Amino acid sequence: MLGALVPALPAFADTAPGAPFVPTPLPVVERMLELARVSPGDVVYDLGSGDGRVVITAAQRYGARGVGVELNPVWVRDARRFAELLGVTDKVTFRIEDLFTTDFRDATVVTLYLYPAMNRKLAPRLLTELKPGARIVSHEYGIGDWPPDHTEEMVVNGERHRINVWTVPPPGDPRPK
């Protein structure tokens, strides 16, 4: 259902502050959530959530709670409208916050589609603030020197997409830098 709304997004990406919004194709979103083994008990955070498609899909398909963190208020406004139109406002929230300072300690799943440098900068917080067993799924990019537990590629509309998955280790396990 979200796919029907995507063409209605305003064309503001070229003038928006920060990193450009490049939406993850819905088949990739769905596979990311499958690989994260999302279930109704999960709290899914999407850091740099854009139009909200990841957390909205997590709520629709899996009954999970979702939190979208996005700096651009226009995208947050649109994400909230999509959530309302799709009937998931009881399951999702969208915050106008900096993803480097937002509190995501209650997340059981974190999704990313950020530049590699941003992922590297987030790595220490992901490792120390998420509970052991939390899953991190990144569309396209790795997280510094932290090797993913699983990597998968898929082709959507002729474009190749990589999905990387990590599980936060217990504190005693060796941790990446």
Residues covered by each model-derived region:
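S-adenosyl-L-methionine
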Residues: P73-D106
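Class I SAM-dependent transferase core
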Residues: L9-S39
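Conserved class I S-adenosyl-L-methionine
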Residues: G41-G50
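Bacterial N-terminal signal peptides
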Residues: M1-A8
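Conserved SAM-binding motif I beta-strand of class I
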Residues: R65-E70
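C-terminal substrate-binding/active-site "lid" region of AdoMet-derived donor-dependent transferases
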Residues: A117-K177
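Glycine-rich SAM-binding Motif I of class I
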Residues: G52-I56
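A short SAM/SAH-binding and catalytic strip from SAM-dependent methyltransferases
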Residues: R105-K121
